[in-house]
Regions:
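Sec/Tat signal peptide C-region and signal peptidase I cleavage site
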Residues: 2-5
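Outer-membrane beta-barrel channel domains
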Residues: 7-177
Length: 177
């Protein structure tokens, strides 16, 4: 119908994961009440949903660490919307607002990523602009604050403020063969 003709190319996808452990004191293998800190269960979970339509994409991720599993940083304790973003990319220019995962070059200077199995996430909440003026040439600028567990983003004194620019020229894509 005409009502739905505008959204036929929209896509929604997502994923979720729940990891859990049940703790039982077993002094024969070194598990004591002290090592499990009185906890009976540790649960780490997340769910994320992404939406795309044409040049636009958006997404959100909910996380819950109730209580974080043994071996994970206790500062992960909590739950809520951990990440969100909206992005527009027409091939020449791309703008992203929200949580950004990226790297400059091979990642030695700047790299943000999340590794769920390790409880690591240093997403950058801010803005990124990518400009591709010619084949093989990419210019990138970004600004934001790094994630620090569940500390509010407004508390700048407790987190890193990152500003950066990056330029790349891939000669293999610049010349026709």
């Amino acid at each position: 119908t005409a009502l739905f003709a505008q959204v036929e190319n929209a896509q929604v996808n997502g994923s979720f994961q729940i990891d859990g452990q049940y703790y039982k004191v077993d002094e024969a293998i070194g598990i004591t009440s002290e090592t499990i800190k009185g906890q009976k269960v540790g649960i780490n979970g997340f769910g994320k949903i992404n939406y795309s339509l044409g040049n636009f994409t958006a997404g959100i991720r909910y996380e819950a660490f109730q209580t974080p599993m043994s071996g994970f940083d206790t500062r992960l304790q909590g739950f809520g919307i951990a990440n969100y973003y909206a992005s527009y990319d027409n091939g020449t220019i791309a703008v992203t607002l929200g949580d950004i995962y990226d790297q400059f070059g091979n990642g030695f200077i700047f790299r943000t990523y999340e590794e769920w199995a390790l409880g690591f996430d240093n997403a950058l909440r801010g803005m990124r602009v990518i400009y591709r003026p010619a084949a093989g040439v990419t210019l990138k600028a970004l600004f934001g604050k790094q994630r620090l567990y569940w500390v509010e983003y407004g508390d700048a004194a407790k987190r890193g403020v990152v500003r950066g620019i990056d330029g790349e020229w891939d000669l293999n894509h610049s010349f026709e063969t």
